[in-house]
A protein has these predicted regions:
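Blade-edge beta-strand/turn elements of extracellular beta-propeller
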Residues: 114, 165-180, 222-234, 269-277, ...
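Non-catalytic accessory segments flanking enzyme active sites
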Residues: 39-138, 149, 238-258, 262-296, ...
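Polar, glycine-rich mid-to-C-terminal structural blocks
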Residues: 212-258
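Active-site-proximal cap/loop segments of hydrolase catalytic domains
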Residues: 489, 502-696
């Protein structure tokens, strides 16, 4: 459930005040497909491409990035569905991708033999749609029938269609096949002929955040509109979701009503009725066999004990439902440690924790009424990712390991065993032998120590004026920034002589819920202060200088870089802001923005707009101030963060006389790009822009 919580967090990722809606001269740019708005976008696009694509070395940069992004030597993580292992794969010949499968024995071989199940490029051509893969949910245990998620252009809204993995065809709706129209929704299998569905059921069925309010139980062959209601959320809630765990003999079906981004109610679906889990609203629960795991986001005093925020507790499920509150503690946080994820297998739970931004892995088993743990080997300054191969139907799992300078490896492991099989390893996309990684700390405005990693030339002092350096950060939604290998970063920046810096800001999850909560709402400036402190520390150490320091961030990180631009422009030589938020006066009225009120606050409330207005980039940019040159990027098909945030910020900055470039992809959703070639173009423009500004 922790992983699902993270995925959900990545998915969801007018009273008084300045610049009220009627005073905004660029509201017309909020019309995503408006003729005037798109004409403006095309004009900006052309100017940006003309400015950057003629740069000396730009073609070579793009080709180098293409070698990385289109390389057949990439990891192919798989999911076991029935007896087969499935993987989704894109390459130069299949830009939209192949859904394919193989056997476990073949997957473990040096050269797996894959069978294509669905060719998305062929489907897109046949149906005249720019389909982007969104995943598959298959009916256990055979996984013959699957619900495939397909989006137009890569947005969060998608269609859901039943697919037969034996025949390789979609199940005809006329023959009783399940299909849901485009919406930000989904469904989970209850049995072969029943789904729990959350989707757009018509007027009034979606929340202010744009997510479903209703969960219905839909029987095959019956009209969707007549499906009986299971749960209904409020109009101001974030939305409802359903999950299914398919452990043999103990399958569970969970339904969640999310009242805010980090709080909600969870229910078990049992014999057609809902049983509420009596947990704290901001805690998340995960069934594991006959046990229930509960992860806390705030302190909980219960059963005569006080459990700290960030703890992971365990108890027998039926005992908990009967009122029992005597928990066993699997993890309790310390000032320097936090739980990053827990993964449930058939007979064990894997805990991934972070100690001062260094990851540790342990395995927990419940035997004879007690939980017992053992440590598993892991790296130091690296990144780990754990994925159950077949959910709770198996003890096998995939472990991905990498660090800034070591290409990622994909390993097959099994609970209870130390031996791991290395399945695949990325090639070295750049020469890392001349680089070194160091962890440093900056001191923020209020005295808080802020850790950051730096990837720099090995054994070489900085030149006069410092290295051309790129500072990346995020600082929100309890999402951790971890060291990891990126061929794109290596080829596009490090191999060009650049230094890379990754900051671990308050608002993130590196030190658990308290680290996140320290930068919520009225404390949001702390995250910005942390970022600025890292920039100042880099300059003070002589690693770089303002004219050679660039910053980059996406989504909330785009807000971060935009705030840094308007608050401390003298610190930076270039800014890249990707799919950003900028208009914090109207963010909650644009697409999924209302779901983020818990993170930022509600600008409709004067007392909350008072602090939001102090940092909202769109309302704080000024004419007559020297700003570094900026590149904004976005996507027309981003239905999570509205492209108007980038569009309007660019228009305002340009009107104020600042040098700003803008590039908007026509598809790609919040990721910004849907195909390999689109990714090549996006990253070539971004790194080419940074090189032009910082390496002259």
């Amino acid at each position: 459930m922790r992983a699902r919580w993270r995925c959900l967090a990545l998915l969801l990722l007018g009273l008084g005040g300045a610049a009220a809606a009627e005073e905004d001269p660029y509201l017309w740019l909020e019309e995503v497909q408006g003729e005037r708005a798109l004409a403006w976008v095309r004009e900006q696009q052309q100017a940006t491409e003309q400015a950057l694509q003629a740069r000396p070395g730009q073609a070579a940069l793009a080709e180098g990035l293409r070698e990385v992004l289109a390389s057949p030597q990439r990891l192919a993580p798989a999911q076991q569905l029935g007896e087969q292992l499935y993987n989704f794969w894109r390459d130069a010949a299949h830009p939209r991708g192949l859904w394919r499968r193989t056997t476990l024995a073949s997957y473990r071989s040096a050269v797996p033999q894959w069978q294509t199940v669905l060719d998305l490029d062929r489907l897109a051509q046949e149906e005249g749609e720019r389909w982007v893969w969104g995943g598959a949910s298959c009916l256990p245990p055979q996984a013959r029938r699957c619900l495939l998620s397909l989006s137009r252009g890569g947005g969060d809204a998608h269609v859901l269609r039943e697919f037969d993995t034996v025949s390789g065809r979609f199940v005809d709706v006329a023959a009783g096949g399940f299909a849901l129209p485009e919406a930000k929704g989904g469904a989970s299998w209850v049995d072969a002929d029943t789904l729990s569905v959350y989707t757009d059921f018509g007027p009034g069925s979606m929340t202010a955040s744009g997510y479903p309010r209703q969960v219905r139980l839909w029987k095959r062959g019956t009209p969707l509109a007549q499906a009986p209601l299971l749960l209904k959320a409020g109009a101001d809630d974030v939305g409802v979701w359903t999950w299914a765990d398919d452990a043999p003999g103990r399958a569970t079906h969970l339904i969640e009503r999310r009242t805010s981004f980090f709080a909600g109610e969870q229910y078990l679906l049992r014999a057609g009725r809902l049983v509420k889990l009596p947990k704290p609203d901001d805690a998340s629960a995960t069934p594991f066999g006959d046990q229930l795991l509960i992860e806390l986001r705030s302190d909980w005093e219960v059963g005569g004990r006080r459990h700290a925020a960030g703890s992971l507790l365990a108890i027998a499920l039926e005992r908990f439902l009967a009122g029992g509150r005597q928990f066993q503690t699997l993890f309790a946080p310390t000032p320097g440690s936090a739980l990053q994820s827990h993964t449930v297998l058939r007979s064990a739970v894997l805990l991934l924790r972070m100690d001062d931004v260094k990851q540790r892995l342990s395995e927990w088993r419940y035997t004879q009424g007690r939980w017992r743990a053992r440590a598993l080997p892991a790296g130091e300054l690296g990144s780990l990712s754990v994925t159950a191969l077949a959910g709770q139907r198996s003890d096998r799992y995939l472990l991905t390991r990498s660090d800034f300078l070591t290409p990622a490896t994909l390993e097959l492991a099994e609970a209870g065993r130390d031996a791991r099989q290395t399945l695949q390893q990325l090639p070295a996309f750049f020469d890392a032998s001349s680089h070194a990684v160091e962890q440093l700390h900056a001191r923020s405005r209020d005295g808080t120590a802020v850790p950051y990693f730096i990837v720099k030339p090995r054994g070489v002092p900085p030149p006069a004026g410092g290295w051309a350096s790129l500072l990346y950060g995020y600082g929100g939604f309890e999402i951790s920034m971890k060291p990891g290998y990126s061929g794109v970063l290596g080829r596009g920046w490090l191999s060009q002589g650049g230094v890379y810096v990754l900051a671990n800001l308050r608002g993130g999850g590196e030190f658990g819920p308290r680290w996140h909560q320290a930068a919520l709402r009225e404390q949001r400036q702390r995250s910005f202060d942390d970022y600025i402190a890292v920039a100042e520390d880099l300059i003070a150490r002589g690693i770089t200088s303002p004219k050679r320091l660039g910053i980059m961030g996406g989504s909330l990180g785009g807000l971060l870089t935009s705030v840094a631009l308007v608050q401390r422009p003298e610190l930076f030589g270039a800014v890249v802001s990707q799919v950003p938020l900028t208009d914090m006066r109207r963010y909650h009225r644009l697409l999924a923005g209302a779901s983020w009120i818990e993170e930022y606050g509600n600008p409709d409330l004067p007392e909350q707009w008072a602090y939001i207005s102090k940092y909202s980039p769109y309302h704080n940019s000024q004419a007559g101030v020297a700003y570094p040159r900026v590149l904004y990027t976005s996507s027309t098909r981003d239905d999570r963060v509205h492209p108007a945030h980038a569009r309007k910020m660019v228009a305002r900055l340009q009107a104020q006389g600042h040098e700003v470039l803008y590039w908007e992809n026509t598809e790609g959703g919040h990721a910004g790009a849907a195909t390999i070639e689109q990714q090549v173009k996006l990253w070539a423009l971004s790194y080419g822009f940074l090189a032009e500004q910082l390496m002259r």
